């Protein structure tokens, strides 16, 4: 490794990843006491940030010794030392520029103090707060984002599905007539295909929607399949149904802007496969309110979160409206809700549960951290399929972005696995006005 550095950690880094102390190699880490004070405010509650705060404090308690405040406590083999900076550190440079005594400015003071104390050693603030990084740079302090789980090139996940032109028309004819598809060796693809990648094959006179099946090493035709009254309106939606319906694909990511049909397609596919699962679970994170704010709303827990679950019920109503109100399909949906065979609820309510034989759909997954996504996936028991939907550019969490959110992180880590499939939906199917707003505003 290069020259050893000092890193000063902001509270939001810990709330994002409670294991962050293990990700700074042999460099030393400094923890301002004000960070511990801020963590104390987050320990109560059942959201992921509350869990992260508690876990970090527990980990800190295990490594605490008398040297933590003086010479630093060793973090383990291949890692540096951890220091807790107790008390208030005065920094004339910080005080002159930012006279208000708030936690952010106290953290900046620690960075400045370390810089003055060790002029030959880089001292760097690590924070996910963009404004705090701007303040640090304005007075000449080094700073950076926490990049351990960042995905560098997200553009590749937002492309339309590949269209391969100049394909031998006889191959396309054979794909149409073959149930098993054709061996991939018969095609001359320039790039290696990812497992379950969907694409269009075109010749000068015909075309076919296709998918690479990694289990049979074949290129198979994608059929236009209808699920519980919902019919795909374009090639991308056909691709989505293809991977949503395949029992061999246990993990699916559907991305795309608003109006592309991500959640509706996932729910329709789940309903179409009901005989294969004991339960359908549709959940989304509550982003707009913290736990404390949620408590001030009237009603019980379900009534408090109901407004944030409404978009999921709206998708269910779209499916119901495909049938007559007195039809067996609508009655079946209502019976499923009454018997908890179809459950729509806030993501926080399912934390800690083991999900077996469940078709689990997590909506707005771009608002989850990588650790949250991992935690949810590890809850999957036998016979469970997990689908994550979201727009990786529409982030509502203050310390996540298009490169660090859990959805894009999952796609990046899983895209070469046979059990995983990703489909990006580009074409909006709501209304002309909705499409115009998504593209221009």
Model-derived features: where do they sit?
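Hydrophobic anchor at the beta1->P-loop junction of P-loop NTPases
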Residues: 254-256, 266
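Conserved RecA-like ASCE ATPase "motif II neighborhood" in helicase/translocase motors
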Residues: 16-18, 338-361, 365-375
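N-terminal pre-P-loop "Q-motif" helix
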Residues: 229-248
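Pre-Walker A (Motif I) flank of P-loop NTPase domains
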Residues: 247-253, 357
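Active-site-proximal, substrate-binding regions of enzyme catalytic domains
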Residues: 3-124, 130-227
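Conserved P-loop
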Residues: 264-332, 397-418
């Amino acid at each position: 490794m290069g020259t050893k550095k000092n890193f000063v950690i902001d509270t939001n880094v810990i709330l994002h990843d409670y294991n962050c102390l293990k990700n700074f190699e042999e460099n030393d880490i400094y923890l301002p006491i004000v960070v511990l004070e801020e963590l104390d405010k987050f320990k109560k509650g059942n959201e992921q940030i509350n869990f992260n705060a508690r876990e970090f404090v527990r980990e800190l308690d295990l490594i605490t010794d008398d040297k933590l405040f003086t010479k630093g406590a060793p973090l383990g083999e291949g890692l540096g030392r951890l220091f807790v900076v107790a008390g208030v550190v005065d920094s004339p440079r910080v005080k002159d520029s930012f006279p208000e005594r708030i936690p952010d400015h106290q953290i900046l003071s620690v960075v400045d103090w370390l810089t003055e104390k060790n002029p030959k050693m880089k001292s760097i603030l690590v924070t996910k707060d963009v404004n705090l990084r701007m303040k640090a740079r304005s007075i000449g302090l080094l700073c950076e984002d926490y990049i351990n789980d960042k995905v560098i090139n997200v553009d590749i996940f937002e492309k339309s599905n590949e269209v391969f032109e100049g394909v031998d028309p006889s191959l396309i004819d054979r794909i149409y007539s073959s149930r098993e598809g054709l061996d991939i060796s018969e095609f001359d693809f320039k790039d290696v295909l990812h497992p379950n990648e969907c694409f269009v094959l075109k010749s000068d006179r015909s075309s076919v929607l296709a998918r690479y099946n990694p289990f049979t090493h074949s290129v198979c035709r994608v059929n236009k399949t209808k699920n519980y009254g919902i019919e795909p309106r374009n090639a991308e939606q056909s691709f989505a149904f293809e991977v949503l319906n395949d029992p061999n694909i246990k993990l699916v990511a559907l991305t795309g802007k608003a109006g592309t049909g991500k959640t509706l397609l996932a729910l329709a596919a789940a309903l179409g496969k009901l005989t294969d699962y004991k339960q359908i679970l549709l959940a989304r994170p509550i982003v707009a309110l913290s736990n404390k704010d949620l408590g001030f709303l009237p009603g019980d827990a379900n009534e408090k979160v109901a407004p944030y679950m409404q978009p999921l019920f709206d998708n269910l109503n779209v499916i119901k409206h495909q049938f007559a109100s007195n039809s067996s399909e609508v009655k079946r949906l209502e019976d499923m809700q009454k018997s908890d065979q179809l459950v729509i609820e806030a993501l926080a309510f399912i934390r800690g549960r083991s999900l077996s034989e469940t078709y689990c759909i997590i909506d707005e997954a771009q608002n989850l951290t990588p650790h949250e996504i991992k935690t949810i996936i590890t809850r999957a028991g036998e016979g469970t399929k997990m689908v994550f939907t979201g727009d990786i550019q529409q982030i509502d969490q203050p310390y996540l972005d298009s490169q660090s959110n859990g959805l894009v992180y999952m796609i990046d880590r899983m895209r070469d696995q046979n059990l995983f499939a990703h489909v990006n939906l580009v074409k909006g199917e709501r209304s002309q006005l909705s499409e115009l707003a998504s593209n221009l505003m």
